[in-house]
Amino acid sequence: MMEQLLQSTPSWTNVAIFFAIGVGLLLVVLGFVTYGILAERKVMGFMQGRIGPNQVGGRWGLLQTVADVLKLLLKEDTIPKAADRPLFILAPVIAFAPAFMVLAALPFTDALQFADIGVGLLYYIAVSGLTTIGVVTGAWASNNKYALLGGMRAAAQMISYEVPLVMSVIGVILLSGSLNLNDIVAAQKDVWFIVVQPIGFLVFLIAAVAELNRTPFDLPEAESELVAGFHVEYSGFRWAFFMLAEYVYFFAMAALTTVLFLGGWHPLPFLGFIPGAVWFALKFSLVVFLFIWFRITFPRVRADQLMEFGWKVLLPVALVNIFVTALVKQLFF
């Protein structure tokens, strides 16, 4: 259906259909993120010996996050007098829009994908970097020293870890011979890339956590140092945009990890009778659990340690991985 719409003559009907599909996808994403946050809180509670949300929506707290969303929507929307008003208003949208856009290129099964982009991996890397513009814009427009420092940290962290993140997937590109995410999954039909690219997987995983600004790399919004970081002056639904962008990227990165290193929807040997969507969901959930585990386990690192680790450890390891992968492919494939 999507291919037919793309190839058809442009018309207002097509625009309306695309708009309706976009709104529907946005509602699905928001619903998934809402209950994804609840799942994270329950897992964190379990790991810390707590019950977690259990008051709103029954024993499992199923409506707790919904109540939190309603609370955010009802909160007063304040704009500081000294803020750059147009940029302050626009920044949350700039931060959230790319997070929503990257989902279009991610294949969840061989039949479930919004748009099959020939260079889906390149598209994801390019578009995801735009969110930092929104973060820095919001930090600067707030006219607050803590917000500005958080925005500068976010920009420095993104630059420092985007490089090893991209370098870590070059081994995957060498083995699959494509930037198309569907082709990358197809290349893992026999052997998942986590088996032949363990170093690349570790570098990608660490760099992904840093890109997501999650513990132990949550320096741009370190409460003990910066109050709330780059969004310290935001409240209500504008603050919710930043939070949603963070969690949409969180789940999108887990899906990308599944596609690049865990074989996507391909099953384990002798278990092909289980549908591909189930396999993708299981692998995706495993990666999400791993990210949550990191948040619970590790303490926050210092800013200088963060920069030093990215440039002096991850980047050289990623370069060595590229060299070894190219050598092995040349000799044995």
Curated annotation (Swiss-Prot):
One Gene Ontology cellular component: plasma membrane
Record protein name field: NADH-quinone oxidoreductase subunit H
One Gene Ontology term from the biological process aspect of the record: aerobic respiration
Quaternary organization: NDH-1 is composed of 14 different subunits. Subunits NuoA, H, J, K, L, M, N constitute the membrane sector of the complex.
Chain's role: NDH-1 shuttles electrons from NADH, via FMN and iron-sulfur (Fe-S) centers, to quinones in the respiratory chain. The immediate electron acceptor for the enzyme in this species is believed to be ubiquinone. Couples the redox reaction to proton translocation (for every two electrons transferred, four hydrogen ions are translocated across the cytoplasmic membrane), and thus conserves the redox energy in a proton gradient. This subunit may bind ubiquinone.
Species this protein is from: Anoxybacillus flavithermus (strain DSM 21510 / WK1)
PROSITE patterns: COMPLEX1_ND1_2
GO molecular function: NADH dehydrogenase activity; oxidoreductase activity, acting on NAD(P)H, quinone or similar compound as acceptor; quinone binding
Keywords: Cell membrane, Membrane, NAD, Quinone, Translocase, Transmembrane, Transmembrane helix, Ubiquinone
Family the UniProt entry places it in: Belongs to the complex I subunit 1 family.
Membrane topology, record value: Multi-pass membrane protein
Annotated catalysed reactions: a quinone + NADH + 5 H(+)(in) = a quinol + NAD(+) + 4 H(+)(out)
